[in-house]
Amino acid sequence: MMHKKRWAALVLAAALALTGCSFGGVGGGGNTAQKIDRPAVESAELQFTHPAAGDTVAVFDTSAGVFRAVLFPDKALQAYDNFVGLVQAGYYNGLTVSRVESGFVVEAGQGADGRGSTIWNGGRYPAETTDSLHHYSGALCMGTDASGECASVFYVVQTLPGEQSVTQELVDQMNSAGYCAEVVSAYQTAGGAPYLDYTDTVLGQVYEGMDVVDAIGQTAVDENQKPREDITINSVSIMQYE
């Protein structure tokens, strides 16, 4: 297993990787979203394996459209239990997208208190990390607070594909950190935020509707990175892939 100390270099590279990745910054975005051409990723990595019959998927019905993500309960059991429990309780229904960083992340799930909730009476749970899941574009992740713990806040990685987000410098640092070739190759095609690996929980991967996530990612935001016009999560549903 890759030692977490090797991540220092990638974390230091984060600021460089994010420079210039936005479509507009504060107040950015426009009335018509720019279509992002995302290539198909041919990879043996779990996140790029199409869902199989019986896999658990989450369906996000938003005011901007619908997107779907396959979940990986075997890799993040506490996050899965909490997320599914909150979905079944209707917690996310009616919440709005709380943060958008174009070309980086789309985030929601804070709730009225701005902190989020859990099925354990608000008690936090630790981030769950694994060598099997990574912050590729389209990854569904659970946000962490300052203590490194999670609640209901989730985000989708909305980084641009290929070298638009994964620069040669990041590739070199992944190689130096001991990444396997398959992971580096997947990052080079899909794009992503490798500097977030091993810092928080990857719970799933968007397999349909990434164009909706991209459209949300290009919305105009205020100085707090909140969309100027509300983008509402009408509902989140858990179902089995058929």
PLM regions: where:
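Sec-dependent bacterial lipoprotein signal peptides
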Residues: 1-19
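Cyclophilin-like peptidyl-prolyl cis-trans isomerases
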Residues: 2, 21-242
